[in-house]
Amino acid sequence: MAKKVIGEIKLQIAATKANPSPPVGPALGQKGVNIMEFCKAFNEKTKDMVGFNIPVVITVYADKSFTFITKQPPATDLIKKAAGIAKGTDNPLKNKVGKLTKAQVLEIVEKKLVDLNTNDKEQAAKIIAGSARSMGVEIVD
C-alpha cells in the first residue's frame, strides 16, 4: 500500500546551497522532515547546476519520510545567463538590456521543454521569447 501523503512543499533554492536556515528550515520543520537529510540530498543532486535557483517539489509522507523532484531553472535565469545580464528592465518597451539569438532561444527551449505546458518546440520558443521580451531582451536572427 502506498504511503499517506501529508503535504507538499514547493521552494526555489540556489543549487548546492540548501541549508537549515530560512526558507528551507522552517518550511520542512513544520512538516517534521529531517532538514539535514534533505539538504544533503538536494545539494548532491544539484551539484551540476551551480549558479541557478532550482525549483523543488518536496512530498512529505505520514511517517515523516520525503521524496523530492527538482525541476529545471526558471526561464528568466536561463535568459539572463544567455544574454549576459544581471537583471531585466523595469520598462521593457523603452529599455532594452540585452539580445538573444534564435539559436540561444532554442538552447533554452531544449533545457526547459520538460517543464513547459507544451511539447511543441515552436510553441515553447514563443513562450521563452515572450519571457525574454518582458525582461527587455531583444530576440535577433
UniProtKB/Swiss-Prot annotation:
Write out the GO cellular component annotations.
cytosolic large ribosomal subunit
Q: How is it modified after translation?
A: One or more lysine residues are methylated.
SUPFAM superfamilies xrefs: Ribosomal L11/L12e N-terminal domain (SSF54747), Ribosomal protein L11, C-terminal domain (SSF46906)
Q: Does the keyword 4Fe-4S apply?
A: no
Q: From the record, what ranges are coiled-coil?
A: none
Q: Does the keyword rRNA-binding apply?
A: yes
Which CDD domains does the protein's record reference? Ribosomal_L11 (cd00349)
SMART domains tied to this protein: RL11
UniProt keyword list: Methylation, Ribonucleoprotein, Ribosomal protein, RNA-binding, rRNA-binding
GO annotation terms (biological process): translation
The GO terms this record gives for MF are: large ribosomal subunit rRNA binding; structural constituent of ribosome
Family listed: Belongs to the universal ribosomal protein uL11 family.
Assembly: Part of the ribosomal stalk of the 50S ribosomal subunit. Interacts with L10 and the large rRNA to form the base of the stalk. L10 forms an elongated spine to which L12 dimers bind in a sequential fashion forming a multimeric L10(L12)X complex.
Name the NCBIfam families on file.
Answer: L11_bact
Q: Which PANTHER family does the entry mention?
A: 60S RIBOSOMAL PROTEIN L12, LARGE RIBOSOMAL SUBUNIT PROTEIN UL11M
Q: What does this protein do?
A: Forms part of the ribosomal stalk which helps the ribosome interact with GTP-bound translation factors.
Q: What is this protein called?
A: Large ribosomal subunit protein uL11
UniProt source species: Campylobacter curvus (strain 525.92)
